């Protein structure tokens, strides 16, 4: 598995478990408590969960080319914007430590993707 694939798999797994699944499955009251956002229905949270899941599918499409030695520029650019933007917004607007932890995670993913763009040959090397 390449370093880039490892980064993408980590992003998919952690975000899927800690962000997408809760948005799709947790009760509205729990999501409102965690996010400090109140809505008339759970639809807002569910739609956001679907949007995050769609991004995770996009990340998954970057793994096969990376394993074949081709750099998935579109996936990496998408991930840099998504994770970098998310990290900045969470840092600026965060009101609790859970948001800061997510900001750090997204920021590290963005930095990893930027490093991959700077050194694509290194990102495609096998991690083991």
Indicate where each model-derived feature is located.
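Membrane-helix boundary elements
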Residues: 3-8, 18-43
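Non-cytosolic membrane-interface motifs at loop->transmembrane helix junctions
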Residues: 35-42, 70-75, 98-108
